[in-house]
Amino acid sequence: MRNVAFSNWTRRALHRVVAMFWVALMLAPLPGTAFGQAAPSGSSIKIGIIGSGNIGSTVGTLWVKAGHQVLFSSRHPENLKQLVDGLGPRARAGTVSEALTFGDVIFIGVPYGAYPQLAKDYGKEFSGKIVLDAGNAVLARDGEIGKDAREKGVALTSARLLAGGRIVRGF
């Protein structure tokens, strides 16, 4: 019998949904609490966000509301003042280097075309970190790295660029 609910899904789309579920589960507060509630004392995860645009700020806001400590980074951290002031003491703003030092978990929310420069500037700082990779290569926008990711796969390309990081594809 064929499962009609998933028959129109591509394998990649199904994998993305499953990966997002596991990432959410991994970063969720302890059982018995809801995402909107603060995490119980002592269970907070320190998360560094690289790229605090639409995706990074939205996901980071949810993590702060769930009780985790989040450092939002940007090339211009002063532009994040309103965001972090509105989220309270668990949120702060800083540079990419500060986010990498701060976070036990790193969330990357920048265009995929920025990954080679990110790797060049901060590659060794990803070593040993759990890296939640939200990047998706778009050929028209991301040039050569987009072509490379299309041919070899985004996960393998990210793993090569961010060598030493424990890559989790999430989006």
Describe every region a protein language model picked out.
Residues 3-21:
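Bacterial N-terminal signal peptides that target proteins for export
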Residues 16-32:
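Bacterial N-terminal signal peptides
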Residues 88-91, 95-130, 134-142:
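Rossmann-like NAD(P)-binding element
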